[in-house]
UniProtKB/Swiss-Prot annotation:
Subcellular location, record wording: Mitochondrion matrix
Function comment: Mitochondrial tRNA methyltransferase that mediates methylation of cytosine to 5-methylcytosine (m5C) at position 34 of mt-tRNA(Met). mt-tRNA(Met) methylation at cytosine(34) takes place at the wobble position of the anticodon and initiates the formation of 5-formylcytosine (f(5)c) at this position. mt-tRNA(Met) containing the f(5)c modification at the wobble position enables recognition of the AUA codon in addition to the AUG codon, expanding codon recognition in mitochondrial translation.
Binding site residues for S-adenosyl-L-methionine: C140, A141, A142, P143, G144, G145, K146, E163, D194, D212
Catalytic site: C266 (nucleophile)
Biological process per Gene Ontology, one example term: regulation of mitochondrial translation
Gene name of this polypeptide: NSUN3
Transmembrane segments: none
Record's protein name: tRNA (cytosine(34)-C(5))-methyltransferase, mitochondrial
EC number(s) on file: 2.1.1.-
Leader peptide range in chain numbering: none
Enzyme class at the top of the EC tree: transferase
A molecular function GO annotation: tRNA (cytidine-5-)-methyltransferase activity
Reaction catalysis annotation: cytidine(34) in mitochondrial tRNA + S-adenosyl-L-methionine = 5-methylcytidine(34) in mitochondrial tRNA + S-adenosyl-L-homocysteine + H(+)
Length: 338
């Protein structure tokens, strides 16, 4: 049940294979939800040779020579100066072509100079608008890219990175150790709590909360190596919105009145995105949506957004020359009255 990808070069081994079970499932769902846009999205998602990788520079071990080299290679700075909130301390570079820098190896005691990521994953971080001294919770933090990006934006008074999965928690710890200097580690707490329990454990504690929720993860699901497991995942997919809603309820409890919450996923699924946010807004009188449409207008040079069906959020969809996403982002504010 696997469709083989065409080789980029004849002598190379096949790096990835598309799982037909997943592709057929996505075809049925997303052709309805995205309309004609799905054709381009599908072409990008099923062609890893088209994928792009952004380079997030580490301000704690700044690679000046690498930055010069990126400029020479035609990379440009992400969104610099185009958003009301874009910290000068955060430097991320993009290439219009699908070029990937080599990953740095983890070496104990040596900080890495850069982190490779899907550029769209920085939008939830920017939407959170973290300021120096604030208490922030990254509820589902592994593998750590968004926690790392938050620390490129500001010096929080307290950063709580939580991850329930023990294997992913190890990955999170290694990411933080690889990029963050020891003095700053003192303001970071890493925990292994079920995210659904965080609100009861730390009620009204945080100024800002990021919920980068477990989701269908369309890019990786398309390349599932085991068709039977993929079919099982698809059948269990209907349970994800319930989990996402429970995580959001917990996050809202943990958020102080007046605080901001950003919800994000890396799936195109309306059920896991807009429908979840709509349910939250219908369930809480003290939770209000924050309009982030301006982000789409100012980011259109680097990202393509789904044109319809995103009343309370933004959905980045992969496009030709802008192969970023999927990434859904919604921003909420907790009022002082209940």
């Amino acid at each position: 049940m696997v469709l083989t990808l065409l080789k980029a070069k004849p002598e190379r081994k096949l790096a990835k294979q598309i799982c037909k079970v997943v592709l057929d499932h996505f075809e049925k769902q997303y052709s309805k939800e995205l309309g004609d846009a799905w054709n381009t999205v599908r072409d990008i998602l099923t062609s890893p040779s088209c994928w792009q990788y952004a380079v997030l520079l580490n301000r704690f071990n700044y690679p000046f020579e690498l930055e010069k080299d990126l400029h020479l290679k035609g990379y440009h700075s992400l969104l610099q100066g185009s958003l009301p909130y874009y910290p000068k301390s955060m430097k991320c570079y993009l290439s219009r072509t699908p070029h990937r820098m080599p990953s740095e190896r983890h070496q104990t005691g040596n900080l890495k100079k850069y982190y490779l990521l899907n550029a769209a994953s920085l939008l939830p971080v920017l939407a959170l608008e973290l300021r120096d001294g604030e208490k922030v919770l990254d509820l589902c933090a592994a593998p750590g890219g968004k926690s790392l990006a938050l620390l490129q934006c500001a010096y929080p008074g307290y950063l709580h990175c939580n991850e329930y999965d023990s294997l992913r928690l190890r990955w999170l710890r290694q990411t933080l150790e690889s990029f963050i200097p020891q003095p700053l580690v003192n303001v970071i707490k890493v925990s292994e709590l079920d995210g659904r329990e965080m609100g009861d454990a730390q009620p009204e504690t945080f100024d800002k909360v990021l919920v980068d929720a477990p989701c269908s993860n369309d890019r990786s699901w398309l390349f599932s190596s085991d068709s039977q497991k993929a079919a099982c995942r698809i059948s269990q997919r209907r349970n994800l919105p319930l989990l996402q809603m429970e995580l959001l309820r917990s996050a809202i409890k943990a958020l102080r009145p007046g605080g901001l919450l950003v919800y994000s996923t890396c799936t195109l699924s309306k059920a896991e995105n807009q429908d979840v946010i709509s349910e939250v807004l219908n369930s809480y009188s003290n939770i209000m949506p924050v309009d982030i449409k301006e982000m789409a207008r100012t980011c259109s040079r680097d990202f393509t957004f789904a044109p319809t069906g995103q009343e309370c959020g933004l959905l980045v969809i992969p496009d030709k020359g802008k192969a970023w996403g999927p990434m859904y982002v919604a921003k909420l504010k907790k009022s002082w009255t209940t």
